[in-house]
């Protein structure tokens, strides 16, 4: 049996959102992540704890969170998978459902299958 990604669609969505909001990786406040995702601050706080336990996020003082080196590499890799999944799924899904479908697909597939979706 092939191993699938250990990241959930929600984990991936948070990593990619953090990457997009904090391009220089100086740290981002949880309230900014909550606003971008339409989530509550407690939900974001819980996810930051989860991602920190996985080694993807470092929680800093004053509610700042930054992607670790591993988090940056993972977010970069998954951003390519996400873009490829969106290209693949766009004909079958409305704009409203496309993001959810893309995150679900990349969370469900093993990484070698995701790599085959990415050109070059």
Model-predicted regions and their roles:
Residues 1-15:
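Short alpha-helical segments that sit at the start of domains
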Residues 24-34:
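Short acidic, hydrophobic short linear motifs in intrinsically disordered regions
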Residues 42-45:
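Key DNA-contact positions within bacterial/archaeal DNA-binding proteins
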Residues 48-49:
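Short, hydrophobic-biased segments on the C-terminal half of alpha helices
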Residues 63-81:
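Basic, amphipathic "hinge/linker" alpha-helix immediately C-terminal to the N-terminal HTH DNA-binding motif
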Residues 83-120:
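Amphipathic alpha-helical dimerization/coiled-coil segments
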């Amino acid at each position: 049996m092939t191993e699938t990604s250990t990241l959930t669609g929600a984990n991936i969505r948070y990593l990619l959102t953090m990457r997009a909001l904090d391009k220089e990786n100086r740290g981002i406040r949880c309230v900014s992540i909550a606003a971008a995702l339409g989530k509550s601050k407690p939900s974001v706080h819980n996810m930051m704890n989860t991602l920190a336990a996985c080694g993807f996020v470092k929680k800093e003082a004053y509610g700042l969170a930054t992607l670790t080196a591993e988090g940056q590499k993972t977010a970069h890799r998954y951003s390519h998978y996400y873009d490829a999944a969106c290209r693949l799924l766009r004909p079958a899904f409305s704009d409203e459902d496309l993001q959810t479908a893309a995150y679900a697909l990349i969370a469900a597939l093993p990484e070698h299958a995701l790599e085959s979706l990415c050109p070059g």
